[in-house]
């Protein structure tokens, strides 16, 4: 089993999308990259803690490669928007890859370089590629948020 952690705006739709991929064993919504221990959603929404809304993914690398997760990640959001996605703005909504190994770092950066060379997006990619920090699981009401409410999609 391996881990991947991505921030792509509001974590509700991101979590639901990754749950649908074959080889993904579990997905948890949470917060990462900030300076406050055990933050709450209310804390993170102040835009003062430095945390991003993220999903932490447990996946089987024999069934789905990290590159495939990256393809899904870049297809879920606009990685050229700095600190926002759609109507949501603030550093908590930044585009970020928290890598769990030097290999993930290399693969993620090469993936971004390839997307840039292919001119896949009309503006520069601003996605951060940074070492994984402490993942703080979000409150239970954020887990499987769309599923619990019978919603198919979020605004991402």
From Swiss-Prot:
One of its GO terms (biological process) is protein modification process. Transmembrane segments: none annotated. It is an enzyme of class 1 (oxidoreductase). The active site is at 10. GO terms for molecular function: L-methionine:thioredoxin-disulfide S-oxidoreductase activity; peptide-methionine (S)-S-oxide reductase activity. Keywords: Oxidoreductase. InterPro entries: Met_Sox_Rdtase_MsrA_dom (IPR002569), Met_Sox_Rdtase_MsrA_sf (IPR036509). It comes from the Bacteria. The keyword Oxidoreductase applies. It catalyses: L-methionyl-[protein] + [thioredoxin]-disulfide + H2O = L-methionyl-(S)-S-oxide-[protein] + [thioredoxin]-dithiol; [thioredoxin]-disulfide + L-methionine + H2O = L-methionine (S)-S-oxide + [thioredoxin]-dithiol. Has an important function as a repair enzyme for proteins that have been inactivated by oxidation. Catalyzes the reversible oxidation-reduction of methionine sulfoxide in proteins to methionine. Belongs to the MsrA Met sulfoxide reductase family. HAMAP family: MsrA (MF_01401). This is Peptide methionine sulfoxide reductase MsrA. It comes from Acidobacterium capsulatum (strain ATCC 51196 / DSM 11244 / BCRC 80197 / JCM 7670 / NBRC 15755 / NCIMB 13165 / 161).
